[in-house]
From Swiss-Prot:
Positions of the catalytic residues: E249, E334
Catalytic activity: Endohydrolysis of (1->4)-beta-D-glucosidic linkages in cellulose, lichenin and cereal beta-D-glucans
Region named Disordered: 46-100
GO MF terms, alphabetically ordered: cellulase activity
Gene symbol of the encoding locus: celA
Protein family: Belongs to the glycosyl hydrolase 5 (cellulase A) family.
Protein name: Endoglucanase A
Biased composition (Basic and acidic residues): 46-94
UniProt-listed GO biological process terms: cellulose catabolic process
Hydrolase is among the record's keywords: yes
Source organism per UniProt: Butyrivibrio fibrisolvens
Enzyme class: hydrolase
EC number: 3.2.1.4
Record's signal peptide: 1-34
């Protein structure tokens, strides 16, 4: 039987053991942090906030640093791209200066339409569609035969895109056809023959121009003209691209009646073939009023009008406009952007007015004066250039570059469809 004392000691021992066990458990939990005691709660929350706050800030710092790195990288890439672009532009500029001007035209060429005719006031193709001839006039082939060469004609067709060239053969000036003997006549005809062949090979029209000038009245050498054009027609009867200009610029006291009398005798010789014939008008090819009063009674006839932008302005444009509105068929076989004497500075403002009128308003065909390297404002080749082809910008005058620019502005559809380039413009200029 257990005594009271033993029972008491046993209870005491159990209590001590319980205290030891519970204390051990709490001690271990406290050290490992698995149990949170009430007195630990406030401190634990504070520590949690301290831990959480850096967790919010650290991603921001990382993102900001990343953005800065990306921004710096983009700036480097942009700088590199800009340097490469500038280098490319500089290289292309050098290339443009060295290469022929065909790059300016993107290889566009004015259309060749085949056989032409005159209907009303318009030059048309075989289907009756209006056409546009744009090109150049040589200076006198008596002085500058080299620019009527096959090399030059092919180059201008390929690089400038023109579709007509006018061969200015002077009749009474230096080495003129009518004043320098038979041998000279044969040389001039050989030049024409080579040029006609080159134009034909390159799908171009060619104007054979009986270039009267100091012989103010074309009747002075009428017999020579009849003989010459008779020979030309027999030689080129099968060339539908040949156009005949029977006199250049009647001047002085020459009247339209004088020109009319001359034309009535020369035209029948050419009319043996149904070619286009251009007839010069009085007062240096500016008097269309006289023609309106008494036009010629032939088919496929056009009347020439000449202007120089430095000399001829609004009054002359109005005179041409009146004639065109009356239905007179006009061909501008010679024009320049400088003064009427062929020299002086380019008058670009007036030139643009003229061009807008003759091309956009009326679609009048034209040839710019002059294809040579003569030291004067109207020459298209610079005086220090002796090349005959593959001209660069440095080789060309302002007049030539203006013409190339005008051709380059024509739309592709304009070149192929003919009438789309006729756009009414403001007439008050």
């Amino acid at each position: 039987m257990v005594s009271k004392k033993q029972k008491f000691l046993t209870v005491i021992l159990v209590i001590v053991l319980a205290i030891v066990i519970v204390g051990g458990v709490f001690g271990i939990s406290f050290v490992k942090g698995r149990v949170t005691f009430p007195w630990q709660l406030q401190n634990s929350e504070a520590k949690t906030e301290q831990v959480k706050e850096p967790a919010k800030e650290e991603p921001k710092l990382v993102i900001k640093e990343k953005k800065q790195d990306e921004s710096a990288k983009k700036e480097q890439e942009l700088k590199k791209a800009k340097e490469e672009a500038e280098a490319a532009v500089e290289k292309e500029t050098e290339k443009t200066e060295e290469e022929p001007v065909d790059n300016l035209l993107n290889d566009m060429k004015l259309k060749y339409y085949g056989k032409l005719a005159v209907e009303g006031s318009h030059l048309v193709d075989a289907d009756g569609h209006e056409v546009l001839l744009m090109g150049v006039s040589t200076h006198g082939i008596n002085w500058y035969p080299e620019y009527a060469s096959a090399e030059t004609i092919k180059s201008l067709r390929d690089t400038w895109g023109i579709n007509v060239i006018r061969l200015a053969m002077y009749t009474s000036d230096y080495n003129g056809y009518c004043v320098a003997g038979k041998e000279n006549q044969e040389k001039l005809k050989d030049i024409i023959d080579d040029a006609v062949e080159a134009a034909t090979d390159n799908d171009m029209y060619v104007i054979i121009d009986w270039h009267t000038l100091n012989d103010a009245d074309p009747n002075e050498y009428k017999a020579d003209a009849i003989q010459f054009f008779g020979e030309m027609v027999r030689k080129y009867k099968d060339n539908e691209n040949v156009i005949y200009e029977i006199c250049n610029e009647p001047n002085g006291d020459t009247t339209w009646n004088d020109v009319r009398r001359y034309a009535n005798e020369v035209i029948p010789v050419i009319r043996n073939v149904d070619a286009i014939i251009l007839v010069g008008t009085p007062k240096w090819a500016t008097d269309l009023d006289s023609v309106l009063d008494k036009p010629l009674d032939f088919d496929n006839i056009m009347y020439t009008y000449h202007f120089y932008a430095g000399t001829h302005h609004k009054a002359e444009r109005n005179a041409l406009r009146d004639a065109l509105d009356e239905g007179l068929p006009v061909f501008i076989s010679e024009y320049g952007l400088v003064d009427a004497d062929g020299d002086g500075n380019l008058n670009e403002k007036e030139a643009d007015y003229w061009y807008d009128m003759i091309r956009k308003e009326y679609g009048v065909s034209s040839c710019m004066w002059n294809l040579s390297n003569k030291d004067e404002g109207s020459a298209m080749i610079n005086a220090d250039c002796d090349k005959l082809s593959d001209f660069t910008e440095e080789d060309l005058s302002e007049s030539a570059m203006w013409l190339i620019d005008q051709i380059s502005q024509l739309k592709h559809s304009d070149l192929e469809q003919g009438v789309d380039w006729i756009t009414p413009e403001n007439n008050n200029r």
